[in-house]
Amino acid sequence: TRALTRRFAYLVTELGILPGNLLCVTFTNKAANEMRQRIHNLTGDEDTGYINTFHGFCVSILQEDSHAVGYPKSFLVLDNSDIDAMLQIIYDERGLTLRDMTFSHARDMIEMLKLKERPEYYEDMITLPLDTLKEKYQKATSAKDIIFYGYLYQEKKCFALDYNDLIEFSLYIFRTHEDIRLKWQKRLEYIMIDEFQDIDPPQYELMQVLCGYHKNLFIVGDPDQTIYTWR
């Protein structure tokens, strides 16, 4: 983190790069806040550019360009308690109980389905009308499908996104809207990533896209420190 902080300060103070043209990605909000404070101390600049987690940065992308996927700028970012509230609605509507699947297991299952088994799920969320998603949910018979399609339906109905969606929706926008992709690529002159050993494939793809114009990517990682080996 110290290496990234020093590099950020050098780019701003010595090379005259505007902080708004720099992206620095950390893995936790705590690390991002610490880095902002360190950079402010080094540069004296109130503007510390984009220093954020992957998900926090994707919120910035979507707040600017969510119209490209038919979502309002005021979309909701879901935490676990929000997801559990949606699961409760689904369980009540379809007569499921915690004996069928606990909420914790259901959350894990949804994440694994989105990452591994059904990675194109976001196309359903973006392109299918709400009624069609509802129909998929109502026609589902297995607990797995009831929970998964019920959850996608609830998300779309509330204009809500979970952490997986933030990345996938951003990637979808960049794949389908060249003008938006180019705008972000040109804006981000230098990209730096901390804890690179814990990155997952969608996050890796997002970084590849973003550094595709200036091609200035700087990463810091330690393979002995990885905490997400399942990725």
What is the predicted function of each stretch?
Residues 58, 114-118, 192, 211:
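Short alpha-helix boundary/capping elements
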Residues 54-57, 106-113, 169-170, 187, ...:
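Short acidic/histidine-centered micro-motifs embedded in hydrophobic/aromatic stretches
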Residues 1-71, 77, 158, 182, ...:
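P-loop NTPase Walker
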Residues 46-49, 67-164:
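ATP-hydrolysis module of ASCE/P-loop NTPase motor domains
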Residues 1, 23-24, 31-32, 50, ...:
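Conserved helicase NTPase motor core
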